[in-house]
Amino acid sequence: MPARPGTPTLLREINDRTALELLLVSGPLTRAELGEHTGLSKVTASQLLSRLEARGLVQVVGSRAGGRGPNAALYGVVASCAYVAGLTIGPDSVTAGIADITGDIAVEVTVDPNGADEPVRVVHDAVDKAARSAGISFSDIRVFAIGTPGMVDPRTGDVRFSFDLPAWHEGVLDSLRNDLGRPVMIENDVNLAALAERSVGAATRESDFALLWLSVGLGLGVVIDGELYRGRSGAAGEVGYLPVPGAPAPVTVAEPRSGALPTIGGAFQALAGGETVMSLAAEHGFDAPTPGAAVEWAVTGGESAEPLLDELAGRLAVGVASICVVLDPGLVVLAGEVGLAGGEQLAARVQRRAAAMCPNPPSVVASQVEANSVLRGAVLAAVERARGEVFAGPE
């Protein structure tokens, strides 16, 4: 297939996008500084800034003193040139965040989904509330990105099934697009957490890593060569079903209910899932209301609580070693409420135990993404899409 010729229009589009991305990363620059960073002549840089200013994408945000002569104008990206919405959907809560083109989340609201049995209504109402809180119109939102538990078909972008959200099934993507009237992306929640970790967390320098989500349920986000790996059907990362030593084999997986996978009766989920973590805490004398609370107690409870941390680390290491001998990610990030509560104390223990079980021991660290990593990943995915549209050229 012949390459697209370097027409003046195409070259302008490339230069414009390069300049906008540079301004987002570096902050405001003068015309001369922009030329130095991009290699553009002063005349070309001036023409570029005039174009972007006319499109409402950049503006003068200040000035900088130089040598002789007047101060030079500083140009920055107009943050309000596009807004996006990121959402996390769960059976007990729905959180919506509004961000501008910089990716900064301005407003975050959480609403009761009432079981999330009406996906379109739930999403629309949550975004409407967030938009009003942000002081923008619903129509100002350019892209929506939604994180859900369960499997998303990588070929269609639609939900295949969500065990915790039975109303979220095939066809929901079209329904959301018809209602919202804008591009909508649905992604597995753990995959979005991995995107956040790659962009602003512990994996910013890694092109190959795995994020192990530890909460009530278990999940895995895999990044290979800088890209999410979803598998043929979107089931990559369903590590709750991973057969591991020390857990009964999940004999019911071959008999799923219509539209959903069965409850996990064994495997890694039984060895290290949330219910097991709370049961282990009870055995060690602590009645924990959540898996995260159990691990927080183990971290802060002194010598009497350390056996729980050691026990959990040993169980997690079995899964980590199994993952690493297949994928060899180099880095494993422990995320979710258990990973965050355990911090580096749990991560270091898991690393030591995993190193004894596999020939390619990984580095194991705790997540460094603050607050809601799934929401952060959803916003980042939406911003990337919005930038691609807004920066591409005049509509």
What are these regions, as identified by a protein language model?
Residues M1-S63, G67-D140, L180, A247-E395:
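ATP-binding/phosphotransfer module of carbohydrate and carboxylate kinases, centering on a glycine-rich
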Residues L87, I101, V143-P262, V383-E395:
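Phosphate-binding/catalytic loop of phosphoryl-transfer enzymes
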